[in-house]
Structures are given as C-alpha cells and as structure tokens.
Regions:
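Flexible loop/turn segments at secondary-structure boundaries
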Residues: 43-44, 67-71, 146-149, 184-187, ...
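Replication-associated primase and helicase/ATPase modules
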Residues: 1-16, 25, 104-108, 130, ...
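Short, well-ordered alpha-helix to beta-strand connector turns
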Residues: 31, 56, 105-106, 204-206
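Conserved inter-motif catalytic segment of the P-loop NTP-binding fold
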Residues: 59-153, 239-242, 253-256
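The Walker A/P-loop phosphate-binding site
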Residues: 1-82
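Helix C-cap/helix->beta junction micro-motif
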Residues: 55, 135, 171-172
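Phosphate-binding/switch region of NTP-binding enzymes
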Residues: 22-24, 41, 160-256
Length: 256
C-alpha cells in the first residue's frame, strides 16, 4: 500500500456537523477508520455526503456505488434545497447555474471507479497530495463491497481491505469513512445491531454507526464507539430529520 513516512499521529476530531452527534460523543477522528453501515436505501450515502459537504475539509470521495451524474444531482439538492428531480433539470438545462452552486463543494475530490483496487485508492490520494501539498483530511469509501481485492473469498477480501484502509488512515492522518452493508435478515427497527454488519469487519473501525430510515427521520446508532457511548444492539440511536427527495438531513431543532 503506502510506505509509512512519518510517525503515527492523529486522533484529532473532524469539524462537527450535527449537534446530536456531538451531544452523544459521535466524533469522526483523523488517523482512524469509521464506518456507516445499513441496509440498501437506509441513507448511508446521504449521511456521508452531508458530512463531506459540511466539514469543509479537503475530501477524497470514492464513489464506486454511484455515478457522477447522480452524485451531482444529490449534491446540488443538498446545497440548494431543490428536489432531486428539480436539480436534475437545472443541471441539464442551466449548467452554469449548477456549477455556481456546486462550487460550495469544491473541497471534495471525486473518483467514480466502479471497482477500485487498493493501489487505485493510493493513486487518488497521491494525486491530491500533489495538487494540494497535503493529504486529504477525509477519505470516504462508498462502499466496501466495491473495493477490489485479489484472490480469496469475499469476506476475507473485505477484512484485508479494512486492514489496508487502517494503514492508509495512519499514514495520511486522514479520517477514513467506510460505507458498508448490513444483513437484511436482521431487524433495522430502529437500527441494525453491530452483529448485522456483513463480513465480520467490526474489529478495526474505531466508530461504527448503523442507520435506519423511519418516515421523515433517520436513526443513527453508535454500535461501536472507542471514544464514547455505544450500544451494540442498535436500540439507542440519535435522530436526525431526513427527507431523501431533497437530500435534507439536519438536527431536529434545525428542521425547516
């Protein structure tokens, strides 16, 4: 992967985004791997995109699961408050207007390789280092099952990928955020338990959040938290206001 060129540093918290997270010691930290896990459609990517946009820190977003057009549409909605259908129309018919709004996310650097290997991820990080003169502060992998690993069975490959991503976090002092699936056979009411995370990859992340969607709310449960409160059952989540049509995600007291 990457040669370790400096002593391990890190652990600094990333900029806060949601008060509900701060109040419950849900903190994303540099030089650590964190994970957001949930069933398909639960809002994992929406939460990750909101974090990337609002932290305003140099970010590498590896969007293996979603194409560039869809991510632009989602991001435009999140920035402007338009619905995704309205955003798609504006991006198509008035690209200059769209570019002006999307400039608020100029700190996010994108890769849309649908099956990146660890070497590809390393190359993307190196390209940002050459451009900015420093490593990205946040690296988002969306999602773990799309990371290509040579040989071996699928779950073993995911565990190997997690080990390499931990090395990457330490080497770059970046907060690495991995999106992953939970088993659909487990209840997601309000959130899946830690045992539902696929592939037995629970050991390495410092923070694991599972998510569930409930009407106009997103439940976010810290099922593992090295630096704060956790409940492996997923039964004690924090709540955010959530409207996926508008890519709207906010603390309850800020709901519009």
């Amino acid at each position: 992967m990457r040669a370790v060129g400096r002593p391990d540093i890190g652990g600094e918290p990333m900029p806060p985004v949601f008060r509900a997270f701060d109040d419950n010691q849900i903190i994303f930290r540099r030089a650590e791997v964190s994970m957001i896990a949930g069933q398909p459609g639960a809002g994992k990517s929406t939460l990750a995109l909101a974090l990337a946009l609002r932290m305003q820190a140099p970010t590498l977003y590896l969007s293996a699961d979603t194409n560039a057009h869809t991510m632009a549409m989602r991001l435009y909605s999140m920035i402007t408050g338009n619905s995704q259908s309205e955003s798609e129309k504006i991006i198509s018919e008035n690209p200059e207007q769209a570019k002006q709004a999307l400039a608020q996310a100029r700190h996010i650097y994108w890769s849309f390789d649908s099956n990146p290997g660890l070497g590809d991820i390393d190359d993307e990080v190196t390209a940002i280092e050459e451009l900015l003169g420093e490593s990205p502060a946040l690296i988002i992998v969306d999602n773990l099952m799309d990371v290509a690993m040579d040989g071996g069975e699928e779950f073993g490959g995911m565990r190997s990928a997690m080990k390499e991503l931990k090395y990457l976090a330490r080497d770059t002092n970046a907060a690495v955020l991995v999106l992953h699936h939970t088993k659909e056979s487990y209840s997601a009411d309000p959130c899946p338990p830690r045992s539902a995370v696929q592939g037995m990859v629970n050991q390495l992340p410092a923070l694991i959040l599972t998510v569930g969607q409930h009407q106009e709310m997103m439940a976010v449960a810290p099922v593992k938290n090295r630096y704060g409160k956790a409940d492996p059952s997923g039964n004690t989540p924090v709540w955010l206001r959530f409207n996926p049509e508008y890519m709207y995600l906010a603390d309850l007291e800020e709901a519009r």
